[in-house]
Amino acid sequence: MQSIFGTDGIRGRFDKEITYSLAYKVGYALGFIVKTNNPILIGRDTRISGEILFEAISKGIKDAGKEFIYLGICPTPAIPFLIKKEKFSSGIMISASHNPPEFNGIKIFDKNGEKIKRDFEKRIELIMARVDNNKIITNKYKSVSKNNELLNIYTKGLIDSMENENLEGMKIILDACYGSATTCAESVFKKLGANVKVINNDKDGLKINLNCGSTCLDPLNKAIKENDADMGFSFDGDADRVIGVDSKGNILDGDHILFLWGRELLEEKVLTNNTIISTRMANLGFERNWNNIGGILYRTEVGDKFIFAALKEKKALLGGEQSGHILSKINNFCGDGILTALQISKYCKKKNINLESWLNSSFLPYPQKLTNILLSFDFKNINNSNKDLINESIESFSSIKKNDCRVYIRPSGTEPVLRILVEAQNQKEVDFLSTKITTELRSKINKISNNL
């Protein structure tokens, strides 16, 4: 049987892959597994379906004989931070991160504030399979009060991470993406003295991630120019990732953040073996330039759980993904978009340098093209002959290594798409290869879809 867990928890469309029944079973299973009497912490992003899934999860936890505390709408990193600081037994974040509003998901954290590992996932799935469906009754929803003080503890932690540095004199735009960042990003930057303007700052679960946030930088770029700002940062739906933009519209993605932040740590001589961690999506230009200044880039499969494991294994201090998901020792290696934005702003202030100049001192990326092919089927669940049909092309194209060309193809672990990354030293080669690969794979995918 295929696992319900992907690269970042459980993810899918609400009322299709993610149902009340599934959420109840997850809550019940976690409550059954947890052995201490300390409550389970639950948070969510702004999606409309979040309230329904919270109701189901909390009912499951109660039916398993355990207690919970409801944080309400919050950034995902608040959950692991508070688990460690306030000694919760575990935690759940209800969010589909950067996905559209119709999606939702469930991320589970253990007693150490770490995303659960595969053996824990298997235990949850085993218990879920035993839950009597007759127990899952949708009662009339009873309002549950939120613990607002806990969010204040998290935001204080963000401010403390600045180590008495401030952001006075800096004009910064934030795109809160109608999501979790609406709860505290503005107040944190203001408390640190920044002149802040926030766009898309309503808690609107129908607009979350739509034409805004870390996957759509146009609104941020426009606001930076209109307000003559120094820089800006766009968060995703649950604020665990961030992308920056300088005053000229240049993009500071996760690769640039890792290079610049990593170089500071390299100069401070605190990086273990001069190593930072990223994934197979990381740009070759980033890797080559990082190597040129004496650094080592260790690549993992895509997903912050793989980065986290490598950080532990290599005893590294910094890792992340091109998408802006950055893990640092500051907050126990949990991706935190607000914290990352604060650190980048802090370095600009300390170095007395604008983000444009700092970004220009990093590296010139190789041309890349990322194409997503929508799948009408779950890649994990198709029969072996169909899977082999696609894998044959993936293996063939992935073996291309000529002229610093790189191809990486994978089914997404968070949404129904096949991702195709093509990278080379010139854009013409990238476009040619990308078109060739996409055309062949799309033809095979359509053939499979028509036969299902």
UniProtKB/Swiss-Prot annotation:
Mg(2+) binds at residues 97, 236, 238, 240. Binds 1 Mg(2+) ion per subunit. GO terms for cellular component: cytosol. PROSITE patterns: PGM_PMM. The modification Phosphoserine is found at residue 97. Its cofactor is Mg(2+). Keywords: Isomerase, Magnesium, Metal-binding, Phosphoprotein. This is Phosphoglucosamine mutase. It comes from Prochlorococcus marinus (strain MIT 9515).
